[in-house]
Amino acid sequence: MSEESDSLRTSPSVASLSENELPPPPEPPGYVCSLTEDLVTKAREELQEKPEWRLRDVQALRDMVRKEYPNLSTSLDDAFLLRFLRARKFDYDRALQLLVNYHSCRRSWPEVFNNLKPSALKDVLASGFLTVLPHTDPRGCHVVCIRPDRWIPSNYPITENIRAIYLTLEKLIQSEETQVNGIVILADYKGVSLSKASHFGPFIAKKVIGILQDGFPIRIKAVHVVNEPRIFKGIFAIIKPFLKEKIANRFFLHGSDLNSLHTNLPRSILPKEYGGTAGELDTATWNAVLLASEDDFVKEFCQPVPTCDSILGQTLLPEGLTSDAQCDDSLRAVKSQLYSCY
């Protein structure tokens, strides 16, 4: 008798196994977990993610989308839906609302989200307005460095900066590591003038914060502000009313005290511009990462989509994205708040 037939005879068939002996069904080939054992443990402890229930949870969210929003044009891939479950600690209802908000925000602010691709933002990327540091912090968070002083308002509108921020966040959130660990923002306000600050008025502030808090699947663990001038008090006065208490408590204002910054972000991961030992600030590497992702962004953000009203309705938009009339964003109104700092 052949080796093959011996194997067939001696191997137990599925039918001969009792129910308790049946092997667990294999995970679909569409998703392969890339988390390390430590991150699996962290996700379990902080996000209530149980590996043995992961695909069941994804399927539950997928079923909810199909039932409650059958016409929603969205990816239903395991990896994509996991972003929203992790961002809302595997609460199905909150994850569904976040997913709906995510698409509502994209469709309600076309100036930012239409044609969102790296090649359309080469001027912003070349300016050095933002980058991602090459090293993560001790908690594994990527550090997004934003430098408003690099922006020249006469070159392009502030919405281009916002587009670059969301482009970066979209790229970062593709990583399961980032989905679990979150990100840290390092904002350097050195040299920000009154005229430049006035472009970031209440309406834009409310829209940006509304998306970050309620319309994007990312965990912001801390915002470190350095070199802020006196004018920043006015900027923060504009921002703070729209911040949830949890996020507001994660803002740290260091001024020019880099020692204070180093108690939160070690010098070993910071460039020398911020008293670190990781060399000069490099923006070219992250720009190259984004530009190499051009095809992914074209596929995701440069295709025609139905309007927000026809599928989701304005009532589902996060606060701050429902009506332009909700905030007076005139230059005079903004400057009056900023002048109060002096």
UniProtKB/Swiss-Prot annotation:
Keyword Transport: yes
SMART domains in the cross-refs: CRAL_TRIO_N (SM01100), SEC14 (SM00516)
InterPro entries in the cross-refs: CRAL-TRIO_dom, CRAL-TRIO_dom_sf, CRAL/TRIO_N_dom, CRAL/TRIO_N_dom_sf
Ranges in coiled-coil conformation: none
Recorded GO CC terms: membrane
Keywords, sorted A to Z: Transport
Record region (Disordered): 1-31
Domain CRAL-TRIO: 117-282
Biased composition (Polar residues): 8-19
GO molecular function annotations of the record: phosphatidylinositol bisphosphate binding
Domain of life: Eukaryota
Role summary: May act as a protein that binds a hydrophobic ligand.
Name of protein: Alpha-tocopherol transfer protein-like
Organism the protein comes from: Pongo abelii
